[in-house]
Curated annotation (Swiss-Prot):
The keyword Phosphoprotein does not apply. NCBIfam families: PRK00132.1. The gene is rpsI. PANTHER family: RIBOSOMAL PROTEIN S9, SMALL RIBOSOMAL SUBUNIT PROTEIN US9M. This is Small ribosomal subunit protein uS9. The keyword Ribosomal protein applies.
Length: 163
C-alpha cells in the first residue's frame, strides 16, 4: 500500500515538470488588443524610424506620403504592415511615421520594428507574446562590414600570384 502512494506522488511530480514551460503562449490574447495611442522607435542598418500609432482607419503617413507612394514595392509594404496583420488589427490604427537614413529595405525594417514596439507599448499583455514569437521585437543587428586596408572590399583580397 505504501508503494501506491509513492508512485502517485512521483507521477504528480512528473506531470508538473512536463507541463512547465518557459515559453509564453503566443496565441493568448490575440485580437483582444486595446485601442489606444502608442509610440515606438525602430532601427535597421543606417535607418531610424519614429512611429506613432493612433486609433483610426488604417491610414499610413510616411514622411508626409502614403504607404503606396513611399514603398511602391508590395514586398516592402507587406513587411511594414506585418505586425498589424499578425495581431489582426488592420484598419484600427493610423500610422504616422518619420524615417530617415539608409535605403528602402533598411527603412522598411526600421518601420516594422517601430510599429511592433508601438503595438507592444499599447497593450503589453495581449500583444507581446505573439510579436516576440514572430521575431518582430528583435532588432536586426546586421550591418555592412567595414573595408579593411590592403583589401579591395571588406573581404575581397587582391589576386594572389604564387610566382
Amino acid at each position: 500500500m505504501a508503494e501506491n502512494t509513492n508512485d502517485s506522488a512521483v507521477l504528480e511530480t512528473e506531470e508538473e515538470l512536463t507541463s512547465y514551460t518557459t515559453e509564453t503562449n503566443a496565441g493568448a490574447g490575440t485580437g483582444t488588443s486595446t485601442i489606444a495611442p502608442g509610440y515606438g522607435t525602430g532601427r535597421r542598418k543606417e535607418a531610424v524610424a519614429r512611429v506613432r500609432l493612433v486609433p483610426g482607419t488604417g491610414k499610413w503617413t510616411i514622411n508626409g506620403r502614403t504607404l503606396e507612394e513611399y514603398f511602391p514595392a508590395k514586398l516592402l509594404q507587406r513587411e511594414v504592415n506585418s505586425p498589424i496583420v499578425l495581431l489582426k488589427l488592420e484598419g484600427k490604427f493610423d500610422a504616422i511615421v518619420l524615417v530617415d537614413g539608409g535605403g528602402t529595405t533598411g527603412q522598411a525594417g526600421a518601420i516594422r520594428l517601430g510599429v511592433a514596439r508601438a503595438l507592444n507599448a499599447i497593450d503589453r499583455d495581449a500583444n507581446r507574446a505573439a510579436l516576440k514569437k514572430a521575431g518582430f521585437l528583435t532588432r536586426d543587428a546586421r550591418v555592412v562590414e567595414r573595408k579593411k586596408a590592403g583589401l579591395h572590399k571588406a573581404r575581397r583580397a587582391p589576386q594572389f600570384s604564387k610566382r
